[in-house]
């Protein structure tokens, strides 16, 4: 967190692709080069069981603009004022954490509900973009770089941030007493408490 404290507001990209996502070495290189080539400061979470897949060349390249860590307190980092973008697999928990922190997203979905969530992030909520994979399903560094630049510096960057803040506010309202989530929990408890 000390490193993050020294960064400008909304200048850092957090990259975390979930507990179960598994990239091979070539795909990690593509992801890493896309992150580094974006020119943005970043924190990249690479699980300790995958760190051996990173080339020494990529590690050195990453040292110029960012940090590679094996773990971070994701919600705490997302809530930090320096975070401007979250590159994620679009798992539901990670997406909700970004929503409640008002952070725009770059989605790289893999399976299950992730492609649907990424579509919502991009098309319905307007708070980010999806990385388009190659025809063979491979990640390409140029596309990762393009998406990060689009969210951080593109013509629609203010729209992504404004929409992220709008959804953050809606999430907070839903959780407050009398909000939709609060009401549904009360209804659920009332319905099933007698069983």
Report each predicted region and the residues it spans.
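Catalytic core of nucleotide-sugar-dependent glycosyltransferases
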Residues: 1-195
